[in-house]
Amino acid sequence: MHSLFRKRNKGKYSPTVQTRSISNKELSDLIEQLQKNADQVERNIVDTEAKMQSDLARMQEGQLPEHRDAALQNVSDSEKLLYVLEADSAIAKHMKHPQGDMIAEDIRQLKERVTNLRGKHKQMYSLAVKEADPRVNWDTLVDEKLDKLSSQSFGTDLPLVDSQVEQHNIFHNEVKAIGPHLAKDKEQNSELQAKYQKLLTASQARQQHLSSLQDYMQRCTNELYWLDQQAKGRMQYDWSDRNLDYPSRRRQYENFINRNLEAKEERINKLHTEGDQLLTAEHPGRNSIEAHMEAVHAEWKEYLNLLICEESHLKYMEDYHQFHKDMKDAQELLRKVDSDLNQKYSPDFKDRYQIELLLRELDDQEKALDKYEDVVRGLQRRGQQVVPLKYRRETPLKPIPVEALCDFESDQGLISRGYSYTLQKNNGESWELTDSTGKKLAAPAVCFIIPPTDPEALALADSLGSQYRSVRQKATGSKHALQQRHEVLRTENPGDASDLQGRQLLAGLDKVASDLDRQEKAITGILRPPLEQGRAIEDSAERAKGLKNITNELLQIEPEKTQCTAECEAFVQALPASGTAPLLKTRVEDTNQKYERLVWLLEAAQEKVDVANRLENSLQRGRELLASYENRLIQDDTMPESGHVLDRKRQELEAMASELQAHKSLLGEVGKNLQVAKQCSSSLASRFQEHCPDLERQEAEVHKLNQRFNNLSQQVERRAQSLQSARAAYDEYCSGYNRVLQFLAKTPSYEPQETDSLGQMETKLKNQKNLLDELASREQEVQKVYADSQQYQQAVKDYELEAEKLRSLLDLENGRNSHVNKRARLQSPAAKVKEEEAALAAKFTEVNAINRQRLQNLEFALNLLRQQPEAGVTHETLQGGKLSSGMEETWKIKKELEEEIERRQQLENEVKSAQEEIQTLKDQGPQESLVRKEVLKKVPDPALEESFQQLQQTLAEEQHKNQLLQEELGALQLRLQALEQETRDGGQEYVVKEVLRIEPDRAQEDEVLQLREELEALRRQKGAREAEVLLLQQRVAALAAEKSRVQEKVTEREVVKLQNDPQLEAEYRRLQEEHQREGTLREKQEEELSFLQAKLRRLEKERAMAEGKITVKEVLKVEKDAAVEREVNDLTRQYEDEAAKARSGQREKTELLRKIWALEEENAKVVVQEKVREIVRPDPKAESEVANLRLELVEQERKFRGAEEQLKSYQSELEALRNRGPQVEVKEVTKEVIKYTTDPETEQELQRLREEIMDKTRLIERCDLEIYQLKQEIQALKDTKPQVQTREVVQEILQFQEDPQTKKEVESLRIQLSEEQKKQVDLEGERASQEEKIKRKEEELAQQRKERVVRQEVVQYEDEPDLRAEVTAFTNSIDAELRQIDKLHVELRRLQHRRAELERQLEELERERQARRAAELEVQRLQQRLAALEQEEAKTGEKVTHTQKVVLQQDPQQTREHALLRAQLEEERHRRQLLEGELEPLRRKLAALEKAEIKEKVVFSESVQVEKGDTEQEIQRLKKSLEEESQSKRELDSEVTRLEAKLSELEFYNSKSSKELDFLREENHKLQLERQNLQLETRRLQSEIEMAATETRDLKNITTIDSGTHLNSRLWSLEKELDDLKKMSKDKDLEIDELQRRLGSVAVKREQRENHLRRSIVVIDPDTGRELSPEEAHRAGLIDWKMFVKLRSQECDWEEISVKGPNGESSVIHDRKSGKKFSIEDALQSGRLTAAQYDRYVNKDMSIQELAVLVSGQK
């Protein structure tokens, strides 16, 4: 529930609510407040009823009532509270509270009671004194409450228990409200008081039980959720070879095992203990407690199994990657040796001594290769054991065997640990398997391991072997070549004797140095590799032996070294001038130093290896010792049954504990050896930089050994304690059980007989009562037997829990490398004791019930005997027979009832015993002898259905809300434009709020996390529901089995199958798709709307141009220049084409500029977060897009400038042609003839139009065919709309006299032509767009089809037999790698496609969310602007204070907007004045026409003179003005849209829509009405303009030869037009006066603007993550006093107040922390602040904090 509702209007009691997002805490507070109000109403009702009863008694006595007003006030208060309760109930019901319907029903009942109470009040106090109404029947009320309380049960899930807690709190308050009235009523008897006390005690007990049950179930649910998350994390983890982050997973795993496992286990055990305590205390919610205990136990057991699997997987992953690493190292080493053999051991250009040295080194190299052969063989052996991890991420080509790592219960059956299965299909997290019988199974992949071998590992091992053999052969060949060269050099003539001797000595020193280097490498080769894990002791012993061999070799080298150095020194002394003397001297010193360093290194290495050997020996002894004790303990699955065996087992454990303490000294020895090893390692590291690789492992093993010892000691101690407590409890239980059993066996029977006399019957009755008393006294013994049984069972359970814990720890330690044979566990003795105790309790209950029934039978029979009169023997015998028959019938009925009761109790006990047996058997493990097949039934999840319905409702609300917001946005934009037009000249009142959040907006991530949490909650609830259904099914099955076969033991397993309802999932996906379609449809509608608007503007322009085509002219001479006319028409068309291109270029330029500004603003945003260090860099994609847009902008500007230049040239040419003017000759004929003829040009025009329509029709048909073909070719590219370019062609037509029929035909043809032209333009544009897309696609395909040239270097090798096997191996390896690469490429393409699809969906969702948020913010911002502009108070100020870290600065864009609006207002005024000036010539012309005389003439002319009248020019100017108005409106709309987007982003976090939504709706209604009025006015003006244009054309069509009748009609139309124009002028004048008046009222307003910055510093507690103030942090000890003073000094609270009035603008800086104010003007005058600095602040380059420091003079 994530919505909170607005506060109610305190003046009205309406239950209507409005929602917003709330949290769970707020909803719980709402429910708590609702309960308080309901309790208050209940108390008011009870109090009112009591007062009315008191007044009724007084009225019966003839006295006046006392509580009339008080009772009426209580009723009124209750009604008010009921209004509030209805509203809160509506909120709770709307938020889908589980008890929403129940709460509404309770409130309805309270309302009915209050209504009835008001009626009673009115009736009682309005009538005269009469008979008093009956009082409240408290006895009946208490009985009803008792019955209701006794019928209550306990819920099985947490939501139901929560609702029961809330309901019982209300019930308990009602019970407590009855108490004071019973105390006041003295006439109540003690029996009623006792009933009330019983009711109160029972209500308190239920309240405590519900509270404890709720707390226990909540903690169990928390643990179940944690365990479920942990299990899911391990199941979803990647355990394949692709995961290289396994070391961090290993550290995380060991950290949890060492630090958190015991604590978590303690919590689980604590829950189990508390559950047992609740069951022991006979908690009424036994079923719920047992179910949660079993669920926690099952989940914990599954979690331990997953830990075992995780340990195994980590080990296999480490082995896999270590093998590949070692293999890579070995291959690198062999490649290096091969390279050395090729380069270093070449015999070319070397003398004899160098070759001898190379031969010695080559001998050493061959020895090293001999030793390295063991490494290669070891890697080959390890390759046989490597697990094929690659198959975990892909399905193998054929089924492969897998091995189970743990026990797991799947839907199809049980998976046993250690058994083999066959993998059929790899589905990622889940695998499809088959067992040995062919049964199909499905289980998580984490529970299985694919056994060796790995084909890739085998191929690598074979490749390594081939490489090793090749290197050996090459070494042999190199040695042979060096030997041959050496023999050749020996036969050659030696040179100078001294040089020869020097070279011999150098060769000897080189040999000694190479020997020393070889020994040093051998020592480091021993020190650097870590000891082998499985044979550390043997490995350390072998290394010690190797060091001893090195010592012997070093002793052999020492004499040779001494001899060589002595000979070299003698040679240097004898021949110091020899060329080799300096080199010999240097070589001698180096050899001596190297020898000394080697001796020290050898000593340190021997000490290190010896210490490591001792440490490993001590660790091995400790492990073997602990393993022996652990193996002895792990054999005990459960506790022995008999008492003597218990004592013997306890003695064994005590002896084991003493032995462990005796061997504790071994751990001390291990610790000492570890310290010595650390010292040796530190010495090697400091002197020789040789670090020990085994030290960390040895420390971990020592720590693990100590931990195992402590665990073992605790295990032994706890087991001994459990045995001791079990022994004592078992002895007590046996003695009590035997006593009660003997007593029950010896219980006498006092059944009434037919022949019993009255005295005998009384004696039997007395004995039966004594027997019942004795049974009642024995009941305490039965309870003691039950308590002893529970204590024994708990001890056994603790013992078994410790055994299971030890087994789990050992599994985790060993990693389950080898499978332990499963064996059937023995039945727990606790189960046997539990069965005996249950049977004893059932038998005792049976005996007690039988004897109570006997007592009733005896009393009944005794009463019958006492009622019979004394009579004769015959009558007495007859009466006795009748009595016996009646009693027999009664006894039969009661006997049947008794049998049914016993049967029911027996079944209940058997169900309980079966449940306990199920739990016991689950703790013990699976019984191999019994198998139970279960049928799962899918039950719809109520919570999921509820969430589904809520999602449907939310989707419908969001769609409706989006539509309303769009409508409100359009209305408010119109209203904003009108108001801004009114306030352009005056001082504008506004508040600039620019908020920069210091923390990042993570709304999307929060929504994703919230959705995940809700989904997890739904899954848990669904799992709980399915578990309950399964439990009920198992109970029914158990009861049926027990009824048919009582002695059968059945092992039940609960299988919880988590599976969502497919229908709900399909519906949920359908709703998501519908949501996406709604968003897409909305975008399409917006695009269609914009297209229709553009089309409407184009049609209006075409209509105006079409109206202008018919030009009315006065013909004087009939002659025209055809060439000039054609040229003018061509220039006109060219002009319109260029103008259209210029406009489109300007629009593209504006759009590109807007995109660039948006990207720059987006990239310029700075996100700062103090808690987390983040580095914000611009998006490279955004930067590249900005660069592309800038290039496009430059190109468009260049094209635009070229178009402007061409347009200017055309305009100048057109002006020159117009200035030429026509040549006119006038010849006047005095004959007057009136002649009506049809214009031949009109006939030609009609014919031309007909032909053009036919052409256009054929062209459209061809275009339709082409478009259909194009659409078939590019169906995937139809989404984008083509750009339509409309060409407007203006043609002037000369018309003399119009025939009415011809005129109608021309109009119809012209309309058809216009429609065909529009269709043609649209189709041509669409065809051009489709052709462009086809061209682009063909280019892309052409680029993809380019040939790729692959150069391959072909090397031909000779067929050498030795390399053939290696080549074959490499070929197979390469083929395998290529296949793997192909698979990876296919997978990569699939993932990329999936990623693109997900990104597209995310972008669509983000656009939808941003569009909705933008619409909401638009409504909020426009409402705020409207409120600010319409406020008419003298002084207006708005103070904005944010406790967050904000930076408020002025917005220069808004200032420019205001200046632009003022300029547009001035322009509108100027246009109105022009219109008024143009009206005057029209009036004068009308007057002249009225006075003119009418003459008829026949006029012939030889040329045409085109003149435009004043009226036509006026119409043209009006049209032009209307177009300018439309253009200005569009520009204003685009500017307002941009500003609205910017302001909505700035005011996002300061919106107040929730508080002002009511006012907005009223304003929205007003604005809609005003918009309608404006639209009507606009249509009226347009119709008037069209009418004026029509009338003017009609007037111009009449020549001077018309008759007087025609002239009068035309004059009448002109008069009407003038009247309309006058009226329009008056309306405009009135509107201008109103605007001036409103502007005058706005101009006198003062403007006050406040910028506020408050910096508060918080300190984050590293332990809790809570934010603290510096004072709290100082008190908590997180910071010292110095830091506290520093942080306090950095806090600030600056506020800028700017007031603008008639005298100008003044600004001050207010320090709200100290109360001081600093004037900015004074700071400018005094020089503390410069004008440049202030301009920087105004332009947002300087923060208010920096300005405040400068103004205050603090810096």
From Swiss-Prot:
Gene Ontology CC annotations of this record: cornified envelope; cytoplasm; cytoskeleton; desmosome; extrinsic component of plasma membrane; plasma membrane
Gene3D superfamilies: 1.20.58.60, 3.30.160.780, SH3 Domains
Assembly: Homodimer or a heterodimer with EVPL. Found in a complex composed of PPL (via C-terminal linker domain), BFSP1 and BFSP2 in the retinal lens. Within the complex interacts (via C-terminal linker domain) with BFSP2. Interacts with VIM. Binds to the PH domain of AKT1. Interacts with FCGR1A. May interact with PPHLN1.
SH3 domain mapped to chain residues: 397-453
The species this protein was found in: Mus musculus
Protein function: Component of the cornified envelope of keratinocytes. May link the cornified envelope to desmosomes and intermediate filaments. May act as a localization signal in PKB/AKT-mediated signaling.
Gene from which this protein is expressed: Ppl
Primary location class: other
Family as reported in the entry's similarity comment: Belongs to the plakin or cytolinker family.
Alphabetic keyword roster: Cell junction, Cell membrane, Coiled coil, Cytoplasm, Cytoskeleton, Keratinization, Membrane, Phosphoprotein, Repeat, SH3 domain
Spectrin repeat residue numbers: 214-315, 321-483, 503-610
PROSITE patterns (alphabetical): SH3 (PS50002)
Membrane spanning residue stretches: none
Compartments where located: Cell junction, Desmosome; Cytoplasm, Cytoskeleton; Cell membrane; Cytoplasm
Biased composition (Basic residues): 1-11
Segments of this protein annotated with the region Disordered: 1-20
Protein name: Periplakin
